[in-house]
């Protein structure tokens, strides 16, 4: 037999089960009565049957044509002319900002060198290096073999 304060006492088990059952019944009744929201349904449920979140803008959804289907609750899903004009004006400003951003990116790309410029610069470097090699073989450049210092430019004593 379980001790006096045991969690597994038969009386506590029966009461806990009854309590959980009552809470489950209330939860099911609430789910049947209220329309389902995006947060109360699974992620694979039909989205069109769910009510919008309070943070979702109904006006923007109506303006873009993405308004959800009615969920049984009477709602006013009209968009006033004033609000529609405001949304159109804001959309125009958003498009303008996007276009200005693209223009600034193009202005900054002025110093991009083309393939021809890169090849011509490479040819100049090759030509200069080969002239040094040819002049060295002819004896025009004197290389000091007994020079002091290291290849890192630090003098060693």
UniProtKB/Swiss-Prot annotation:
InterPro entries: Ribosome_bgen_Alb1 (IPR022784). It comes from the Eukaryota. Residues 1-55 are annotated as: Disordered. It is found in: Cytoplasm; Nucleus. Involved in proper assembly of pre-ribosomal particles during the biogenesis of the 60S ribosomal subunit. Accompanies the pre-60S particles to the cytoplasm. Belongs to the ALB1 family. This is Ribosome biogenesis protein ALB1.
């Amino acid at each position: 037999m379980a001790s006096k304060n045991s969690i597994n006492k038969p009386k506590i088990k029966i009461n806990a089960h009854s309590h959980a059952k009552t809470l489950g019944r209330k939860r099911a009744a609430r789910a049947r009565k209220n329309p389902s929201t995006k947060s109360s349904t699974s992620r694979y449920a039909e989205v069109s049957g769910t009510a919008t979140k309070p943070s979702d803008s109904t006006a923007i959804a109506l303006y873009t044509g993405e308004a959800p289907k009615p969920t049984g609750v009477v709602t006013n899903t009209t968009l006033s002319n004033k609000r529609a004009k405001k949304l159109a004006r804001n959309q125009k400003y958003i498009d303008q900002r996007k276009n200005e951003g693209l223009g600034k990116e193009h202005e900054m790309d002025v110093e991009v060198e083309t393939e021809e410029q890169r090849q011509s610069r490479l040819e100049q470097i090759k030509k200069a290096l080969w002239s040094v090699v040819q002049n060295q073989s002819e004896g025009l450049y004197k290389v000091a073999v007994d020079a002091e210092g290291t290849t890192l430019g630090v003098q060693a004593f």
